[in-house]
């Protein structure tokens, strides 16, 4: 039995893919940005499954209207013990990010988190997943808002579980903390529930930190550096570049051909200390893939920025995943950087799938 998932703020669909590969059925896709919808469909053009309720380009707020909702999903409330529906979504998060605008719940993007919560409360899915930046949980003024949202969800009948998860622990070659909030409808699953986020990790952070990761070495075009001892190769940029055959990927030439910049050759391999112009080290993991807002990541041993193919590998996407070629480079990098790392999403989905199967009526 495939569990139906309604995806909101879908973007390129990295999170959706993680759930699909865990056995969930993506039944509906909602995204506000036209280019994102196009790119979502393009990346899946060779996959046979199409969402049962299709794709919808528009605001999540529209689905708070009963007329719109019932017209789109006439059988949504027709439930039996074998039909389970969940919502997944990562509302745009720069208003809660310490590296972003920090406008909080009153910001344009910050308000979308509340709208997602309102939709969950009103439509009562059997479960939901909310993904966001850790700033929503750890920054004092944002956490007040976050706790208010949790109270609203609890009063609406949900048992809640949350955790800050790092993508590295799921096999992603990138240090990226994310807030994961999972809710189960008590009317469906009962009270006194127990659930632990993070049971499907590949590596523990303590082990990762104990590795002898290389730091900074002089940059030289095309220089060969052998794999160091006492690291986890599968968490390195170089491993994923090779794994995804990035030089022959469809998006391998998608990088900014800017006029020669001294920074392209002067910044050492592994120097990620600056706010912008961070050069990745081939035998280490990447910092958070936040492309945009003047955040520039440089190739470890080439005098250029990284390509879209390389960015996709750093987000742990499968080698077949491609970004629509007709989009602007800026749009492509924004899409890739905004996505939930695929292996992180898949790990969360796998443990959720197992829990639901164990707790079916």
What is each stretch, according to the model?
Residues 234-361:
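C-terminal target-recognition/interaction regions appended to catalytic cores
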Residues 89, 130, 291:
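Redox-cofactor binding/interface segments in oxidoreductases and associated redox assembly factors
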Residues 6-61:
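SAM cofactor-binding core of SAM-dependent methyltransferases
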Residues 66-83, 93-274:
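Class I S-adenosyl-L-methionine
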Residues 1-5:
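Extreme N-terminal starter segment of soluble prokaryotic enzymes
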Residues 43-62, 68-86:
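Short, structured active-site "lid" loops
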């Amino acid at each position: 039995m495939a569990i139906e998932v309604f995806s909101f703020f879908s973007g390129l669909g990295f999170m959706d893919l993680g759930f699909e590969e865990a056995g969930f059925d993506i039944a509906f896709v909602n995204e506000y940005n036209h280019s994102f919808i196009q790119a979502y469909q393009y990346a899946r053009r060779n996959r046979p499954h199409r969402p049962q309720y299709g794709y919808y380009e528009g605001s999540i707020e529209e689905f708070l209207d009963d007329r719109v909702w019932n017209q789109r999903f006439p059988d949504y409330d027709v439930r039996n013990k074998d039909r389970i529906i969940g919502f997944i979504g990562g509302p745009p998060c720069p208003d809660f990010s310490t590296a972003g605008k920090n406008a909080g719940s009153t910001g344009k993007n910050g308000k979308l988190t509340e709208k997602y919560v309102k939709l969950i409360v009103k439509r009562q899915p059997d479960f939901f997943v909310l993904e966001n930046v850790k700033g929503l949980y750890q920054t004092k003024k944002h956490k007040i808002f976050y706790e208010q949202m949790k109270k609203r969800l609890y009063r609406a009948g949900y048992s809640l579980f949350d955790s800050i998860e790092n993508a590295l622990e799921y096999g992603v070659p990138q240090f990226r903390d994310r807030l994961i909030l999972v809710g189960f409808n008590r009317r469906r699953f009962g009270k006194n529930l127990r659930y632990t986020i993070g049971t499907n990790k590949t590596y523990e952070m303590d082990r990762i930190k104990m590795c002898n990761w290389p730091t900074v070495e002089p940059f030289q075009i095309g220089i060969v550096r052998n794999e160091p001892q006492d690291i986890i190769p599968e968490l390195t940029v170089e491993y994923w570049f090779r794994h995804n055959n990035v030089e022959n990927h469809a998006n391998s030439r998608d990088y900014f051909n800017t006029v020669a910049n001294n920074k392209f050759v002067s910044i050492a391999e592994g120097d990620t200390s600056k706010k912008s112009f961070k050069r990745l080290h081939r035998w280490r993991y990447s910092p958070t893939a936040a492309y945009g807002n003047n955040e520039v990541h440089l190739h470890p041993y080439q005098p250029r920025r990284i390509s879209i193919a390389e960015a996709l590998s750093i987000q742990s996407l499968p080698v077949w995943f491609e970004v629509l070629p007709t989009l602007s480079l800026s749009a492509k990098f924004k899409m890739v950087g905004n996505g939930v790392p695929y292996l992180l999403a898949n790990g969360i989905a796998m443990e959720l799938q197992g829990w639901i199967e164990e707790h079916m009526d």
